[in-house]
């Protein structure tokens, strides 16, 4: 690797790791076997009697073909890379060729990752992310705001747009409640496993005695879904209130009496929206979020039923605590599901959370494969 830059060497290591992660989730022989089975099913004329079934098989065939072709392409690029690296020691032109292969590999590996790991129905969608402080007053409310900022910074780093949908400030500091809409390709796919309880341990700036406090805040992520999702919302099930938008949302928050709060009486789900320019728009956005939440509830119910059949329902309170952020007596952010940890708390709080997100995507993909 004599003439290859340090930056390129680092990229090659990263790509090898990502490729290894992909191969831990998917088996090329199994993909090809599945591909043959689906092709065989589609040659049976009777399958076309059921249009819905036929469409499902056609979509599956397309996805499997893409994965199969991309696995071959990535494998062949890695083989080319190996040869080019060997020859690059003596040949400057070949070192340049290594750079070109690495660039091509980056795109190919990313495409493969998205096809295999981000393959959920709503993964490509925008995401609504809500943060709610746990018990503990100002300390928890401040922690909730720190988390909200972390996700907003992460979204900015990704080049995603962020809209504040709801922002209720705390009495002294922090937030009582906040919801943001993160707009970008695969926003929901990346963030879906961030739902859960996040725990903070630090010396509280709000405690005159400078004692160590443990605070909790819960994060909930749901996809922005299209209006064609079949969820019935009956007007008589809704309690709709208007209030004046308030908060430290700065330029994001509208100050007129146009904020809307909707309570879905059968489930007790409460949704607020205050950032749109009119009461009507706020109501439409709130209804859209409510629809997504009801859909999520329905999916969760089905998932629970399956889990109960499989007998693997865990203790929700502990099982839901997904990550700890320790500021004192040492610094450490640790994900309890994947085991990924870092001592660089400042970078994490500034939105550098891709290491956690990527690890959890692989972790859950392995579990479901």
UniProtKB/Swiss-Prot annotation:
Gene Ontology MF annotations: translation release factor activity, codon specific
UniProt keyword Cytoplasm, yes or no: yes
InterPro entries named in the record: PCRF, Pep_chain_release_fac_I, Pep_chain_release_fac_I_sf, PrfB
A Gene Ontology cellular-component term: cytoplasm
Main location: cytoplasm
PTM statement from Swiss-Prot or TrEMBL: Methylated by PrmC. Methylation increases the termination efficiency of RF2.
Keyword Cytoplasm: yes
Domain of life according to the entry: Bacteria
Compartment(s) of residence: Cytoplasm
PROSITE patterns reported in the protein's UniProt record: RF_PROK_I
Keywords linked to the UniProt accession: Cytoplasm, Methylation, Protein biosynthesis
Gene3D superfamilies in alphabetical order: 3.30.160.20, 3.30.70.1660, Release factor
Modified residues (N5-methylglutamine): 251
Function: Peptide chain release factor 2 directs the termination of translation in response to the peptide chain termination codons UGA and UAA.
PANTHER family: CLASS I PEPTIDE CHAIN RELEASE FACTOR (PTHR43116:SF3), PEPTIDE CHAIN RELEASE FACTOR 2 (PTHR43116)
Family: Belongs to the prokaryotic/mitochondrial release factor family.
Protein name as annotated: Peptide chain release factor 2
The species this protein was found in: Thermotoga maritima (strain ATCC 43589 / DSM 3109 / JCM 10099 / NBRC 100826 / MSB8)
Phylogenetic classification of the source organism: Bacteria, Thermotogati, Thermotogota, Thermotogae, Thermotogales
Gene designation per UniProt: prfB
């Amino acid at each position: 690797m004599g003439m290859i830059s340090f930056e390129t060497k680092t990229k090659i290591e990263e790509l090898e790791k990502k490729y290894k992660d992909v191969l831990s989730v998917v088996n090329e022989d199994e993909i090809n076997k599945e591909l043959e089975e689906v092709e065989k099913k589609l040659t049976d004329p009777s399958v076309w009697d059921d249009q819905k079934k036929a469409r499902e098989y056609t979509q599956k065939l397309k996805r499997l073909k893409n994965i199969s072709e991309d696995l071959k392409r990535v494998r062949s690029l890695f083989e080319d890379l190996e040869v080019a690296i060997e020859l690059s020691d003596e040949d400057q032109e070949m070192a340049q060729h290594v750079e070109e292969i690495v660039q091509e590999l980056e795109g190919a590996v990313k495409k493969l990752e998205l096809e295999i790991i981000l393959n959920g129905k709503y993964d490509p969608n925008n995401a609504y992310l809500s943060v709610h402080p746990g018990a503990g007053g100002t300390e928890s409310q401040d922690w909730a705001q720190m988390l909200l900022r972390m996700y907003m910074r992460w979204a900015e780093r990704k080049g995603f747009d962020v809209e504040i949908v709801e922002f209720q400030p705390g009495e002294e500091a922090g937030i009582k409640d906040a919801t943001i809409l993160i707009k970008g390709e695969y926003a929901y796919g990346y963030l879906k496993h961030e739902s859960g309880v996040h725990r903070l341990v630090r010396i509280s700036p709000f405690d005159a005695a400078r004692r160590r406090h443990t605070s909790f805040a819960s994060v909930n992520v749901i996809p922005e879904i299209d209006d064609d999702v079949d969820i019935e919302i009956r007007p008589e099930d809704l309690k709709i209130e208007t209030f004046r938008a308030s908060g430290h949302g700065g330029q994001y928050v509208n100050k007129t009496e146009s904020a809307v709060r909707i309570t879905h009486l059968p489930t007790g789900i409460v949704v607020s929206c205050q950032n749109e320019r009119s009461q009507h728009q706020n109501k439409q956005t709130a209804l859209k979020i409510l629809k997504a939440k009801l859909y999520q509830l329905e999916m969760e119910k089905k998932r629970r039923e399956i889990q109960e059949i499989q007998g693997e329902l865990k203790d929700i309170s502990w099982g839901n605590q997904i990550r700890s952020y320790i500021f004192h007596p040492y610094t450490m952010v640790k994900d309890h599901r994947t085991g990924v940890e870092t001592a660089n708390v400042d970078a994490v709080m500034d939105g550098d959370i891709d290491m956690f997100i990527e690890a959890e995507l692989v972790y859950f993909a392995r579990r479901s494969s």
